């Protein structure tokens, strides 16, 4: 089995790895891939995190479905409680069959690869932490090469690439 998780987790607890691996490693569950999720509030409870998912990915997926029509891929991405979670686990069949992106599109890209190569019946979601926080990025509204701006661009490219590969014609309009 292979488990991946963010390297900048402030509230890291080694039980996260066990929670991720359990459904994949259990011999009777039949899961090949597990995706982590967690409550995205700040440690002091005063701020709701997960800005890119809440303000970009979820609206993008809904807008694309409205624009191009329903698709299995968009339904699949939309079904994840936190698609940008950096925590996932997989068996070796998944690990050997997917390409892992090397930019901020990694999480969406991995989900797209799992979607392409494996049935969703072998995918599960796991609540990996009661308390979760990691280092946060600046918005960088004026710099497309940094912060959340760069992250959003990379994620959009990963989604658009997957849609184009599946036959959706994307035009500059």
Feature locations, PLM:
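Residues that recognize and position ribonucleotide moieties
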Residues: 54, 88, 104
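Conserved nucleotide-sugar donor-binding catalytic segment
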Residues: 96-102
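C-terminal catalytic/acceptor-binding lobe
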Residues: 104, 108-173
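Conserved Class I S-adenosyl-L-methionine
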Residues: 57-62
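Short beta-strand-to-loop acidic/aromatic patch adjacent to the donor-nucleotide binding site
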Residues: 1-12
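A recurrent flexible, glycine/aromatic-enriched loop bordering the glycosyltransferase active site
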Residues: 44-51, 65-87
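Conserved donor-nucleotide/metal-binding helix-loop-beta segment in metal-dependent transferases, i.e.
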Residues: 13-42
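Short, well-ordered alpha-helical scaffold segment located
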Residues: 89, 93-94
């Amino acid at each position: 089995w292979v488990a991946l998780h963010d390297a900048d987790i402030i509230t890291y607890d080694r039980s996260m790895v066990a929670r991720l691996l359990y459904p994949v490693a259990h011999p009777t569950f039949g899961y090949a891939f597990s995706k982590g999720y967690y409550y995205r509030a700040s440690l002091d409870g005063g701020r709701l995190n997960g800005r890119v998912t809440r303000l970009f990915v979820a609206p993008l997926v809904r807008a694309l479905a409205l624009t191009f029509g329903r698709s299995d891929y968009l339904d699949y991405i939309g079904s994840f409680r936190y698609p940008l979670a950096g925590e996932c686990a997989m068996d070796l069949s998944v690990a050997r069959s997917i390409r892992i992106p090397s930019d901020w599109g990694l999480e969406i890209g991995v989900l797209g690869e799992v979607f392409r190569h494996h049935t969703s019946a072998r995918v599960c979601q796991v609540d990996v932490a009661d308390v979760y926080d990691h280092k946060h990025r600046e918005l960088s509204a004026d710099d497309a090469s940094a912060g959340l701006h760069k992250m959003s661009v990379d994620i959009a490219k990963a989604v658009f690439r997957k849609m184009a590969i599946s036959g959706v014609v994307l035009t500059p309009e």
